[in-house]
Amino acid sequence: MDPVQLLSFLLALLLPLGTALDASKQKRDTAFEIYKKLFEVKRKDQINALNNLIELNDVNQQYKIIDIMLKGLFKVLEDSRAILIAAGVQPDGPFPEDEKIKDAYSHTVENSAFFGDVVLRFPKIVHHYFDRNSNWNNLIRWGIGFCNLSGIFDDGPHTQLLGLMSQELGISEKSPDYKNPFKMDNMEFLPNTDAFQKALREEEKRRRKEEKRKEIRKGPRITRSRSEL
C-alpha cells in the first residue's frame, strides 16, 4: 500500500463504524453489547492500518502521515466532546439512541483507542507533536476518562491500552514495571537513529519555511493615497 492510499485509509478510520441498530426495538444494554462487538471489528482495522504504516519503513513518510492523521483525529475528538457534553451524555450511562450522539460516542471511544495505538508504536513522533500542544493534552485526558468509565475497556484484549497510553504520555505516573509492549518491534524506538534525526530536522525546516511564507502573505499591502486616485 503506497503512502497516499495508506493515509486515506487511516483518515477513514477516524469515522465511526456505525451500529446498524434499530434502537427503538433494542434494549439499551443490548445495544451496548452489539456496539462492543462492532468496536472489536473497528479495532482490527485500526491495528492493520498501523501495521501497514510500520511496514513503510520510511521515517519521513511516517512522520508526515502521522502529522496529518493526528490533526484529523483531535479535530474529530474535539467536535465529539462538544456534542456529548451538550447532550449531557454520561460515559457510564445508557448507550445513546440518537444517531448524531451515537456517532460522537463512537468517535470518542474509537479515536481515543486509536491514538493509544499510535503513541505506543510511534512514541517519539507522537511526543514531538503532542508535548507542545496543550489542547491535545486536555482532549485526550478527557477521552481517556470517558473511555475508562464507558465499560468498553473493562474486558477483552484492550484492557491495558488506556493505562499504557496514559503512562507513555505522562498523564499518569509510570509504574516501576512499566514497559511499552511494542518497544522491540519498531526501529523508531532507537533513541538517536540518524533517520529519525534527519526527518526531524527536515520537518522543522519545512515548518519554518511554511510559517515564513504565511508571514509574507499576511504582510502589509501597499495602498494608493487619495491624491494618487
Curated annotation (Swiss-Prot):
Signal sequence extent: 1-22
Residue ranges that the Swiss-Prot or TrEMBL entry lists as coiled coil: 192-218
GO cellular component, as recorded: endoplasmic reticulum lumen; extracellular region; nucleus
Pfam families: ERK-JNK_inhib
Keywords: Coiled coil, Endoplasmic reticulum, Signal
Residue span of region Disordered: 201-229
Disulfide cysteine pairs (residue numbers): none
Chain span(s) of sequence motif Prevents secretion from ER: 226-229
A Gene Ontology BP annotation from the UniProt entry: positive regulation of Wnt signaling pathway
InterPro entries for this protein: Coiled-coil_dom_con_pro_134
GO MF terms held by the record: protein-macromolecule adaptor activity
Subcellular location: Endoplasmic reticulum lumen
Family designation: Belongs to the CCDC134 family.
Cited function: Molecular adapter required to prevent protein hyperglycosylation of HSP90B1: during translation, associates with nascent HSP90B1 and the STT3A catalytic component of the OST-A complex and tethers them to a specialized translocon that forms a microenvironment for HSP90B1 folding. In the CCDC134-containing translocon, STT3A associates with the SRT pseudosubstrate motif of HSP90B1, preventing access to facultative glycosylation sites until folding is completed, preventing hyperglycosylation and subsequent degradation of HSP90B1.
PANTHER family per UniProt: COILED-COIL DOMAIN-CONTAINING PROTEIN 134
Entry protein name: Coiled-coil domain-containing protein 134
Species whose genome carries this gene: Xenopus tropicalis
Gene name linked to the record: ccdc134
